[in-house]
Amino acid sequence: MPAYVFSKESFLKFLEGHLEDDVVVVVSSDVTDFCKKLSESMVGEKEYCFAEFAFPADIFDADEDEIDEMMKYAIVFVEKEKLSEAGRNAIR
C-alpha cells in the first residue's frame, strides 16, 4: 500500500500528469468509516489508517468492477505540523 507525501508544487505536477483533457475529478467528503489497524505490507506488518468513502452511484455510467478500477487514490490535505518526522522526511 504505497503512500506519497507531496509538496504543493509536486502535487500540482502529479495532478497535471493524470488529468487528460477528457478527465474529470470526483471528490467526496463523505467519510463513512475510519479505523487504524495493523496490516501486512511489502515492508512487513505496519499500522495503517483505513477510511471508507461514499459517493452517489448515479453519477457513473459504469458497473461495480469498472468503478472499482476508477478508484485510484485517497487524498488527505494536512498541515505540515501534523506530520510525523517520517511524514516530513517523505515529502517529495
Curated annotation (Swiss-Prot):
It comes from the Archaea. Gene3D superfamilies: AF2331-like. Coiled coil: none annotated. InterPro entries: AF2331-like_dom, AF2331-like_sf. This is Uncharacterized protein AF_2331.
